[in-house]
Curated annotation (Swiss-Prot):
The lineage of its organism: Eukaryota, Metazoa, Chordata, Craniata, Vertebrata. GO terms for cellular component: extracellular exosome; glutamatergic synapse; synaptobrevin 2-SNAP-25-syntaxin-1a complex. It is found in: Membrane. This is Beta-soluble NSF attachment protein. SUPFAM superfamilies: TPR-like. One of its GO terms (biological process) is synaptic transmission, glutamatergic. Belongs to the SNAP family. Interacts with PRKCABP, and disrupts the interaction between GRIA2 and PRKCABP, leading to the internalization of GRIA2. Keywords: Disease variant, Epilepsy, ER-Golgi transport, Intellectual disability, Membrane, Protein transport, Transport. Required for vesicular transport between the endoplasmic reticulum and the Golgi apparatus. GO terms for molecular function: soluble NSF attachment protein activity; syntaxin binding.
């Protein structure tokens, strides 16, 4: 069956489902099994949704899954309702990001009501990703990553919570909310430094926290660096710590060339990602005075 054929069949199923729903509202529904008609309508909406999916009509698929979700709720089938809202969200993601978020939020409300916080957290991440990539609303992405982290923490899924918090920290720093970023990097760094499997990552978190301090105030960065070395002695021998010391020295001397040279040397072994490049450039501008210079690190 071609896509047009699938769409025609889906439209017929939708019409049949609507008839079943109307019939269930009739005066005699109690005598003739109103719930049975609703169950049949649910099944038809779901079949129609899958037909629309095969035809790649994502909005129609999302709408059909939504209709099924509402009927499942009417039947007190919370789990089935939440599943249908998630299916609707996944379909809408390809056509209408805002509607996808609405459906996923509806699913989250049901899951939290059922005490299924780990699943709710997962869907908050999906919403955050839609805000990141489709709607480009970083403040809202941050809010959903934070909510996800809260739910994961409550369920003792600390590794998953930390992943979300690190996303929050990275975006907070980009938005110049440095104190928020510092608190998260320090907290995650402290949590990971005693874990044999994760302690290698701790140096990255302390490095990022120190850079955020540096952008705000050079003295803050010096004091933070001393604190991190005391907390986590392995940090002292890391390339990140050595780079920070060179950058602090260059900044103190207002020596832009020494700063650039130190960054280039570090980058030749460990490639700088976009976030690190942005932060290092912000610090460099304070050496050059009011952002003069070529705005480059190389």
């Amino acid at each position: 069956m071609d896509n047009a054929g699938k769409e025609r069949e889906a439209v017929q199923l939708m019409a049949e489902a609507e008839k079943r729903v109307k019939a269930s509202h009739s005066f005699l529904r109690g005598l003739f099994g109103g719930n049975t008609r609703i169950e049949e309508a649910c099944e038809m909406y779901t079949r129609a949704a899958n037909m629309f999916k095969m035809a790649k009509n994502w909005s129609a698929a999302g709408n059909a899954f939504c209709q099924a979700a509402k009927l499942h709720m009417q039947l007190q089938s919370k789990h089935d309702s939440a599943t249908s809202f998630v299916d609707a969200g996944n379909a809408y993601k390809k056509a209408d990001p805002q509607e996808a978020i609405n459906c996923l939020n509806a699913a989250i409300d049901i899951y939290t009501d059922m005490g299924r916080f780990t699943i709710a957290a997962k869907h908050h991440i999906t919403i955050a990703e839609i805000y990141e990539t489709e709607l480009v609303d970083i403040e809202k992405a941050i809010a959903h990553y934070e909510q996800s982290a809260d739910y994961y923490k409550g369920e003792e899924s600390n590794s998953s919570a930390n992943k979300c918090l690190l996303k929050v920290a990275a975006y907070a720093a980009q938005l110049e909310q440095y104190q928020k970023a510092i608190e998260i990097y320090e907290q995650v760094g402290a949590n990971t430094m005693d874990n044999p499997l994760l302690k290698y990552s701790a140096k990255d978190y302390f490095f990022k926290a120190a850079l955020c301090h540096f952008i705000v105030d050079e003295l803050n960065a010096k004091l933070a660096l001393e604190k991190y070395e005391e907390m986590f002695p392995a940090f002292t021998d890391s390339r990140e710590c050595k780079l920070l010391k060179k950058l602090l020295e260059a900044h103190e001397e207002q020596n832009s060339e020494a700063y650039t040279e130190a960054v280039k040397e570090f980058d030749s072994i460990s490639r700088l990602d976009q976030w690190l490049t942005t932060m290092l450039l912000r610090i460099k501008k304070s050496i050059q005075g009011d952002g003069e210079g070529d705005g480059d690190l190389k």
